[in-house]
Amino acid sequence: MSSSPSRKNPRVLFVTSEVFPLCKTGGLGDVSAALPAALRELKADVRLLVPGYPSVLSGLKYKRKLAEFDLLPHFPPTTLFSSRLQINESVSLPLYVIHCPELYQRPDGIYLDDDGQDWPDNAQRFGLLSKMGALLASDASPLSWIPDIVHCNDWQSGLTPAYLHYHSGKKAASLMTLHNLAFQGCFPPDEVARLGLPPESFSVHGVEYYGNLSFLKAGIYYATRITTVSPTYAREIQHEPLGFGLQGLLAERSNAITGIINGIDTTVWNPATDPHIVKKYSSRNLAAKRINKLALQREMGLEENETIPLFAGISRLSYQKGYDILLQVAPMLADLPAQLVLLGKGDQSLEKQLVMLAQTNPARIAVRIDYDEALSHRINASADCFLMPSRFEPCGLNQMYSQRYGTPPIVHTTGGLIDTVTDLAPDTPAGESASGFHFHEMTADAFMNGIGRAIDAYYNTRLWKTLQHNGMRKDFSWRSSALAYLSIYSLLMQR
């Protein structure tokens, strides 16, 4: 619903299936806490709508009953509660919680059972989330607080814009944020009627997708505007292969799509205050990185040598992350000479090959098969250069963490890696705004060329410090992301 001209601060209903620390399976949970918190600090009236999983209900200090619903004939009775989620000392998020034990009271995961299979009623579970989001964003809401904008996230809330489209009364504008296009929420066509969508919605100009109902396609098709997690990725998804079959529709809606980089928690990722590292430092005393470097070499069993370039990678070990290419490059890197530290888990074949590689050259290569948050901080603080050869990367986080720690990254030119890492181009030898290195072809030779460029720069002390300072000065805060979202909200309120 359009805003009163006298009220500039937007009212936003943020619909999500995850929010940290109550429920999280991946990055969406982090975003759903951090972005609304940053928006509230900028005076936006943002409130969250989340399913009442057991972890949500048990994690809240209080719940106040607001209303009871029988939303659709095929939906169980539902109660809406309100609560608040404390994010930090200064910010708490108002929460609306959908209490429906028949759909959400599950002993295992949010989306999957203990066998790793999708819950068979996921269409109803997240259809209810979407339907409630649409109801609260329309003149049919039982609440006095009505949003100007309903902000939907990934397929789980993708039906909200569709429900709003078929609501004949006043309704909020809708924003659909695409965090992960690979998961599209596809279900058999008989779910259309069960979820209360009209028959005419099941068409190519609607929710139909290769003979099935797709929640994600519905969100893309019906939303007033669309965002995704970096400007380059916003362009990439309009073409194969990164459109995952939706590239045609996304290209049709290109004028409605905006890419906004995710933020990072700059209080957690800050070498000046980091409790996990041996020696704290800032851009004014970068020499302290050497102390961290020697400590990490000792911890990982590498030769202690503060002058040899130390490269690092922290990642899920997978084909998508380019670790098959890194596996080819690692022996060449060790022969330069240079050192390599890797931390991560994933594909078992890659894990075994990387461990074997480290065993053949323990003074130069160290591999830790694990997820270790504290160690990841120490690696960022200690390494000279960070490796990120992802085949595709919608936004990426590790390249932002590394720059915060004065560790220039070497990245494949894709998605958010392009948008967050400024290449040291051959025609700018003084560094200027450069903060890292790009390589373009997804080959070992191209990757190795990028590493070679980095080593040349590393031995140019003045140039290397320029790269470090440039990266550490970049603003990767959630405040920066929130300001970009406020611009989108402003456009939606003017419609």
Model-predicted segments: where are they?
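Catalytic cores of nucleotide-sugar-dependent glycosyltransferases that transfer UDP/GDP/TDP-activated
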Residues: 1-495
